[in-house]
Amino acid sequence: MKTYALPESDYFLSGHASCPGCAVALGVRFVLKGLGPKSVVVVPPSCIAVMAGPMPLSSMRVPVFQTAFETTAAAASGLARAYKALGEDVTVACLAGDGGTYDIGIQALSGAAERNEDILYVCFDNEAYQNTGNQKSSATPWGARTTSTPRGKATRKKDIMEIMAAHRIPYAATACPGYPDDLVGKVEKARAIRGTRFINVLSPCVPGWGIPDDRSLRLARLAVESRAWPLYEVEEGLRYTLTREPAGIPVAEYLRAQQRYAHLTDADVAEIQAEVDRRWQQLIRRTGEQS
């Protein structure tokens, strides 16, 4: 994938209510750069809803439609159809968290994907219900400590990318704010495609992950370089393409930098490494590249 020059215009304003060092806030800024001014965003309850601000105030320079947890993709589908009926060329994008995507909103998202609604759905995955106090979601990885899994989560993270790929939507991709050219480029690419598009953005959470407020981007890069969060695209549910070749550093470098994994034993870390390696080899087979 080519390197993109970041657009100069900003559509996310200062003065919003995010935590210092919030990767979601930076991710939203980059996504809005890729969307541009001819866009409307649909936001369910989440950290993003808090950042967007209470009506009539807004931290975004594009129209914002705040909806219920369960209805993000459904509301966006209606808006997209309305703009099409009016003959207006507007990108309708969903900006949601993992709780509103992997869990509460998955029924509406699956329905929209099955109908191939003309929406761009962006999930900011901070791997827990962070806006309500760091409870586990189905996006929380195995072993991660949350307020509802104080000994570490006992089940695996849901594979939302494979779920979306199984719908055979035109475009799905992973991204993270640690590589802004990759993220903005994928948003721009998705914006030019018709039908349901999905981008999953890893978004380290400062309080939830137990990291200093100047480390969220470092953690995002460690996730990519350790292959815990590979950057890739899936087109039509079949064509897998890596967009960055990771360094392949030990996953321990990523895990040990977070308090939510401080309780893990060396055996636990080795088990996670084995799972990361297994998933990486599976991805490599699908891309047809050499590991």
Language-model region placement:
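Conserved thiamine diphosphate
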Residues: 2-6, 88, 137-193
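Cofactor-binding active-site loop characterized by glycine-rich and histidine/acidic residues
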Residues: 2-121, 134, 139-141, 150-154
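Short catalytic-loop micro-motif centered on adjacent basic/acidic residues
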Residues: 18, 94-95, 171-176, 198
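Conserved active-site and cofactor/substrate-binding residues in soluble primary-metabolism enzymes
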Residues: 22-26, 36, 70-74, 107, ...
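Generic beta-strand/beta-sheet core signal
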Residues: 42-44, 175, 200-202
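Short hydrophobic alpha-helical runs that function as membrane-insertion/retention elements
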Residues: 120-123, 173, 200
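Flexible, low-complexity linker and terminal segments
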Residues: 205-291
